[in-house]
Amino acid sequence: MSEYLLEMRNIGKEFNGVKALDGIYLKVRAGECVGLCGENGAGKSTLMKVLSGVYPHGTWTGEIFWEGKELKASGIRDTEAAGIVIIHQELMMVPHLSVAENIFLGCEPTTGGFIDYDQMNARAAELLARLKINDINVALPVYHYSGGKQQLIEIAKAINKNAKLLILDEPTSALTASETRVLIDLIKDFKKQGMACVYISHKLDEVAEISDTVTVIRDGAHIATRPMSELTTPDIITMMVGREMKNLFPREPHDIGEVMFEARNISCWDVTNPGRKVVDDVSFALRRGEILGIAGLVGAGRTELVSSLFGVWPGACQGQVFLEGKEIKIRTPRDAVRQGICMVPEDRKRDGILPIMPVGHNMTISVLDRFSLRGLIDKDAELVAIQREILRLKVKTADPMLAIASLSGGNQQKAVLSKMMLPDPKVLILDEPTRGVDVGAKYEIYKLIFALARQGVSILMVSSEMPEVLGISDRVLVIGEGKLRGDFPNENLTQEKVLAAAIGKPATNAA
């Protein structure tokens, strides 16, 4: 019997002659968690698609051995039958089906040729209880539950398929801290029961906590496989990016000028519960060249606030907005962009990109009028602008006419940033600008933010990552339960002080 549950040997994969994977090795023992690390575009997702059967045997080179025998999977059914189950970053839930129906999708229990819903609900409830998940009603539609709960339902679905190896691709990117803790504890329990895990995450603190071994790949090549006990987070970062990064936040001096943007008494109401305020009488000012961070707990009202300022909050709103001292009316994103206010949204996949359109068109769609004459687009002029943006933001793409969905998350995010920078905004709103982005791409995005501030652009940034807020902001607003809880200059500001304000201590205005 082989020492390893899984061995991937010398795996190679090409797309149109371009090598996406070149000689990758990955080994996993039963009961072991292997952290798979690499920048966006390094080849992690491609490697997992090879392993999970998305790319069938024959479309790639190398060998896969499972439980000591060569595995030649022709599709996902083969790998799942063997016990290899992948949970993608984008959850594969059917929102209007019940929890039980999602767990048993494709393998529903039947009696007399008909689905036995009583048996299905009972088995689903039993499965969740076995996983110590006691606050989910299996009869309710999945859309009733948060992203964190849906992630747990996906895991229950995998366990129902008798998974021996669980592949988790960025499982906590949209989870709260408490939901993340539940997930990590669950994975630790699985390890004790002998289940293996491949854990892909840009959150290296999570990788360090649950991984026994770390494999790093860069530009499609295997860089190293080492025990986590021999590594530090800076070691992993150095292997990922190919250089030492002493300071993740490349702060650069920039002048802060007069007030550019002001919001007065902004209130917004819940779409589903119109009597409930999600933003409650918030006022603040933003200066020219200033980076203003917005911190707070998940659900505090941060996204609702900035969405209202960009004209995309679907519920009722009231208040006043001033730009360069003059009151402006923003009812739609078109109004905002015309006034010089642009926004990078929180959910890139849903709100930021047109997935089947080319990378280049996703960049220029905000300024097509620049390349239009009598209703016709000057393709040559547009292509020049696209190529300039690709170079400026270091977007990795073989061809700007490829569908943007084919790019890694970090490169998609750079394209979204480009789309919102091309209109030359006076105010740029960034809602979770580095969510799902690797450490190298984060560094490049931070440099870009500082460069924009030096040019006089006013930056309003929402982030759930406290080190990010404190690392790049000149000033920090704290929102809690829809209210402004604090306004702090970022001088000796600590995470503890921000969190204390977020959970309801009296607001402090020190700006």
From Swiss-Prot:
PROSITE patterns (UniProt xref): ABC_TRANSPORTER_1, ABC_TRANSPORTER_2, XYLG
SMART domains linked: AAA
A UniProt-annotated Pfam family: ABC_tran
Binding site for ATP: 38-45
Catalytic reaction(s) noted: D-xylose(out) + ATP + H2O = D-xylose(in) + ADP + phosphate + H(+)
Documented EC number(s): 7.5.2.10
Lineage top rank: taxon: Bacteria
Database matches in Gene3D superfamilies: P-loop containing nucleotide triphosphate hydrolases
GO MF, any single term: ATP hydrolysis activity
Protein's cellular compartments: Cell inner membrane
Sequence ranges assigned to domain ABC transporter in this UniProt record: 6-244, 261-506
Keywords noted in UniProt: ATP-binding, Cell inner membrane, Cell membrane, Membrane, Nucleotide-binding, Repeat, Sugar transport, Translocase, Transport
GO CC, alphabetical: plasma membrane
Claim: Cytoplasm is one of the keywords in the record: no
Record membrane topology: Peripheral membrane protein
InterPro entries named in the record: AAA+_ATPase (IPR003593), ABC_carbohydrate_import_ATPase (IPR050107), ABC_transporter-like_ATP-bd (IPR003439), ABC_transporter-like_CS (IPR017871), ABC_transptr_XylG (IPR013455), P-loop_NTPase (IPR027417)
Assembly with partners or alone: The complex is composed of two ATP-binding proteins (XylG), two transmembrane proteins (XylH) and a solute-binding protein (XylF).
Task performed by this protein: Part of the ABC transporter complex XylFGH involved in xylose import. Responsible for energy coupling to the transport system.
Sequence similarity: Belongs to the ABC transporter superfamily. Xylose importer (TC 3.A.1.2.4) family.
Matches recorded under NCBIfam families: PRK13549.1, xylG
Name of this chain's protein: Xylose import ATP-binding protein XylG
Organism: Brucella abortus (strain 2308)
Gene name, Swiss-Prot/TrEMBL: xylG
